[in-house]
Curated annotation (Swiss-Prot):
Gene name in the database record: Dd
Protein name per Swiss-Prot or TrEMBL: CTD nuclear envelope phosphatase 1 homolog
Keywords: Hydrolase, Membrane, Protein phosphatase, Transmembrane, Transmembrane helix
Transmembrane segments: 11-27
Record's catalysed reaction(s): O-phospho-L-seryl-[protein] + H2O = L-seryl-[protein] + phosphate; O-phospho-L-threonyl-[protein] + H2O = L-threonyl-[protein] + phosphate
Family statement drawn from the similarity comment of this UniProt entry: Belongs to the dullard family.
């Protein structure tokens, strides 16, 4: 009799645990949806005649964007989810075949990434440069682009330079004029040869309250008016972590 009651009690606990997990999942999904689509804080105003004239005097610049931990975070079905809180919903999945094995990646978009891409694509020519394999990076970039044709130029692991177990990214291979190209990347080692052409950003994994991309918009808005991006970005070297 006692053992039967214990079994029923355990079954009840298991059921309650599953219900609680489901509730947490739905709550987190609603929170993320609210944060992603709430009114954005950075307002865009029409340029004044003076600003339009100034912009006409400088060349349009190229903004290079990293993917993992900069715009998105992902984990695959064979990898522990240590970086993502239980119950955190993913935004989309990517299915690829690696070494003849099917792998499914669960991808989380950094908060406000869609709005960020919409805005900066009006100011810059965008380029994706990731140290990930092309089969994965291309699929993620397709999802982020979402038919807008703003992420057409892409560079992958084969375009990187191996460097003591990591990869560096050669910006001069994208644009020979370093006056008008810069990268946003969470890994300082990736742009170690071009510190004056880089904006560091904190690595992102799953924080739904993150606003790093929004915080960059005022600076990016102003940077497009400069003759040489290095004249501004060289002053921020103290922000880069040591590598």
């Amino acid at each position: 009799m006692i053992s039967l009651l214990q079994m029923k009690f355990r079954a009840l606990l298991l059921l309650l645990s599953k219900v609680w997990t489901c509730i947490c999942f739905m709550f987190n999904r609603q929170v993320r949806a609210f944060i992603q689509y709430q009114p954005v804080k950075y307002e865009l105003f029409p340029l004044s005649p003076v600003s339009r004239h100034r912009l006409s005097l400088v060349q349009r610049k190229t903004l290079v964007l990293d993917l993992d931990e900069t715009l998105i975070h992902s984990h695959h079905n064979a990898m522990p989810r240590n970086t993502v809180k239980p119950g955190t919903p993913h935004d989309f999945t990517v299915k690829v075949t690696i070494d003849r094995n099917p792998v499914r990646f669960f991808v989380h978009k950094r908060p406000h990434v869609d709005y960020f891409l919409d805005v900066v694509s009006q100011w810059y020519d965008l380029v994706v440069f990731t140290a990930s394999m092309e089969i994965y990076g291309a699929a993620v970039a397709d999802k982020l682009d979402n038919g807008r044709n703003i992420l057409r130029r892409r560079y992958y692991r084969q375009h990187c330079t191996p460097d003591y177990g990591s990869y560096t990214k050669d910006l001069s291979a994208i644009c020979s004029d370093l006056n008008r190209i810069f990268i946003i990347d969470n890994s300082p080692g990736a742009y170690r040869c071009f510190p004056n052409n880089a904006i560091p950003i904190k690595s992102w994994f799953s924080d739904p309250m993150d606003t790093a991309l929004l915080s960059l918009l005022p600076m990016l808005d102003a940077l497009r008016f400069t003759n040489d991006v290095r004249s501004v970005l060289s002053r921020n070297l103290h922000l880069h972590r040591l590598w």
